[in-house]
Amino acid sequence: MNADGSNVRQITNVDGYDGGPFFSPDNKWIIFRSDRKKEHMLQLFAIDVNGKHEVQLTDNLNQVNWCPYFHPSGKYLIWSGADYSRGPSSAHFNLFTMEINYSDAGFKGGDITQITFDSRADVLPVFSPDGKKLMWTSTRSEDKTSQLWIADWLRGK
């Protein structure tokens, strides 16, 4: 992008919301959330930086998935997700991971694993630049306010 805001291009063009993009460690893919399948029920997608190849990674229309983030190794995605099948008041955001494999030729997601199981919100996960720490925001503190939490990441080194 130029300093004046020119020289930009759109890479998605579908009905609904597309947002929350993050680059892969090799800068060739972007992960993002979208409600194009069902309004407000965010699913995760990957698209190459040219906008030519797109892959849907989650497909549960009762689940809200947001804040996807790459592990620096490029082997995992992490995100916040909540089951909305019984309505928003009973939905609890927890953290989920997916092993991934990608190259210039394509992007493939694997099995989804839930890694936190709290009745309060675990959201906005990020990895340290060396991939050894996981940090997120949670309301699991005694006073239920949003606070920062950290843990060693023991997979995907």
Question: What are the language-model segments listed below?
Answer:
Residues 1-157:
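Sequence signature of WD/YWTD-type beta-propeller architectures
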